[in-house]
Amino acid sequence: MKNDDEQSSLMVAVIGIIPVIWFALLVAPYLSSGLMGILDGVPEAMNHPFSIRLCGDSVKTVLIFLLSYGMGIGIYISTKKHYRRGEEHGSAKWGNVKKINRRYREKRFTKNKLLTMHVRISYNMRKHLRNVLTVVIGGSGSGKTRFFAKPNLMQANTSFVVLDPKGENLRDTGYLLEEKGYEVRVLDLINMEKSHCYNPFVYLKDDNDVQRLVTNLFKATTPKGSQSNDPFWDTAASMLLLALIFYLQYEAPEEEQNFPMVMEMLRAGEVREDDDQYQSPLDELFERLEMKNPEHIAVKYYKDYHSGSAKTLKSIQITLAARLEKFNLSSLAALTATDDLDLPSLGERKVALFALIPDNDTSYNFLVSILYTQLFQQLFYLADHKYGGRLPVHVHFLMDEFANVSLPDDFDKILSVMRSREVSVSIILQNLAQLKALFEKQWESIMGNCDEFLYLGGNEQGTHKYVSELLGKATIDTNTYGKLTGHSGNYSTNYQNTGRELMTPDEVRMLDNRYAILFIRGERPILDEKFDILKHPNVGLTTDGNGKPYLHGAVDRAVASISLGDSLEGEFTDDSLEVEDYELLSDEDLEEIIQKYQ
């Protein structure tokens, strides 16, 4: 802005040379008459401003005037002060809601992402040159679900991936989405017998995908804040898991590629501490594979794992079994035996994928972590290799309870590249401290990658301070009063200006629950009402508008099984895994079905 002002001043100075020369030529004929002649002749010359007569003094007069003009400009520049009246201590102020909304909205209401009651932003990012990555922070009861998540689900304008504690969003908006033509899929970790199945093995395209799966699994099953002084056991356990997965990936039939089969193989790898020469059925399985293909990647990892003593091998197996112990449950084994989710389809047609997790138990959240990672991989791959870099259907991740699910360490880098592929996220947190705890070093990068930040209110002091600093300082006028007593007493008033935060941390804490503070990159902050869900045109199809609640059905699945005898004759057979088609069942039949497969 300073450079622009300097260029404007220079242009005015150059243009000013023209009237200076013109006036000098008017004065030149009277120069020889002295000062009195000039004073008498100039008014007459001004009556005929374009009757310019060249004379012997014309050049001299022009030079004198130009020299004087130049000296005047020089004096002005040397004494010029850089004033910003009314902005001495800061220029922060609230943005104009209507103007900002017009700048970013799409005229058609349903084509937008809803931020506040009067501000929405188009998913056409090439129009406004902002991404639609959003951080939403609000304490318990501030309306993260009611004022942000639900209204955007009701827009029905993208594919959705929704982390849904308690299943509230699914129940309230599922019927609406089906009425709008969506395929609704549910990964239900609360009532697994009602869930669609999710098998991570289906989405393993190459060796790198296997490595990512194992790395993410170990990270997601590591308790928060725990640190191992000796990473050997986890490293060795990951080598064993890689060997088992690579074997299934390349040697087993498709229906046997799942975590229940991994558990069966692990149980078949008996280790006898008193007999180092003992060969388990699993040892024989890999020995046969080595005879067939010594360079097989599964063999390499198994030999690396198997290089220790029997006691060490048993400890490694126990370490891995502890990581995978949830897959011993028949409900989770059934859920992961096959796959119904078809993750790539979210980028090709409108699909709503809900991941239901208990709000008071994080035991199964590792599966959602794996789901997130594979979704990003699948959608990015689909965009790059099939659709020229942009998905035909935008995919919106509504990450409620963001802090409860482990994400890749390079999540900040994933954020920076998803925009161009028509993928966006809404990170929903209770306070800023949660983000700092998850990404101690990258949290600022994550905040910086999101062009929208919506604050709904809360009680965490660090968040109050952060929001106050983002709002900036304004310059305000103040006055002070003085009083002198005595025989000659008087009053005095002094006027001055000073700086003040647009909102102090205390004022941020006291934010009215009806209002939200919105930041959009490159715009003044906005103070606006939270979105009133009852005014949405589709509210009649939700439970908030007395519409039907959505009830997803029960899925009947057989748990994968494998029998490894000492001889291993036939190794893996097609009969070792029974997978039946599922059907939606009534609640009355549910208990009978569960008992049948126990």
Residue ranges and their predicted role:
Residues 357, 361, 401, 429, ...:
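Short loop or secondary-structure boundary microenvironments that flank
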Residues 130-423, 438, 442, 498, ...:
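P-loop NTPase motor domains
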Residues 176-177, 200-203, 441-445, 469-474, ...:
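Short secondary-structure boundary/capping segments
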Residues 42, 48, 59-112, 207-217, ...:
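Short alpha-helical interface patches
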Residues 415-517:
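Conserved ATP-driven motor cores of ASCE-family P-loop NTPases powering translocation/secretion/packaging/pilus
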